[in-house]
A protein has these predicted regions:
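A short, polar/charged loop-to-alpha-helix boundary motif
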Residues: 55-59
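FAD-binding glycine-rich core of flavoenzymes that anchor FAD
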Residues: 65-69
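Gly/Ser/Thr-rich active-site cleft segment
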Residues: 70-173
Length: 173
């Protein structure tokens, strides 16, 4: 994940050199997976992509995680959803000890550019993690806790365009 972000930074720097009058940097993207970040906002994991199918495989004699979620929480959560990946990683001790939260790769890019320590995820990407109530615009914390997720790990969510910080004197949103 860090290499992806470093390449994006190199491209951004190239364009900022070429177009020095740019005043603001607007980030956009899709939820292509999750990365884990530590208390300093550093990436401490690979990018677990939306193609991660581990949540739909049978684990020994147990039903697939996606079916367990459907039965216990009465919600549909596809295997590629970020929180399905996170639950799988928790249950298989795959979350790094230094990790404190997770976010999308583009949210990590924003953190990397601005030095932000805690992820801020737009509601459209938060919904792509799964376990998200689109009417209340928040994660379904009770259901996540039932599945063994520490809700303090959840990234902050915004519904509008928020300032993340600055990069080379330019506002990053």
């Amino acid at each position: 994940a860090k290499e992806i972000v470093e390449r994006a930074v190199n491209l951004l720097d190239y364009f900022l050199e070429k177009y020095p009058h740019v005043e603001r940097i607007g980030l956009t993207g899709q939820m292509h997976g999750i990365v884990y970040v530590d208390k300093e906002g550093n990436c401490v994991s690979p990018l677990y992509t939306w193609q991660d199918a581990r949540g739909s495989i049978c684990d020994g004699d147990q039903i697939p995680l996606t079916e367990e979620i459907r039965e216990r929480c009465q919600i549909h959560a596809a295997s590629g959803y970020g929180l399905v990946t996170h639950i799988y990683n928790i249950r298989h001790n795959l979350v790094q000890d230094s990790a404190l939260s997770f976010c999308t790769i583009m949210d990590y890019f924003g953190m990397y550019l601005t030095g932000r320590k805690k992820p801020l995820v737009h509601v459209s990407n938060a919904a792509s993690f799964g376990f998200f109530d689109s009417h209340k615009m928040c994660f379904e914390k009770e259901k996540l806790a039932e599945m063994g997720v520490d809700v303090n790990w959840l990234p902050d969510v915004c519904t509008g365009i928020e300032k993340l910080g600055t990069y080379r004197g330019r506002t990053v949103t």
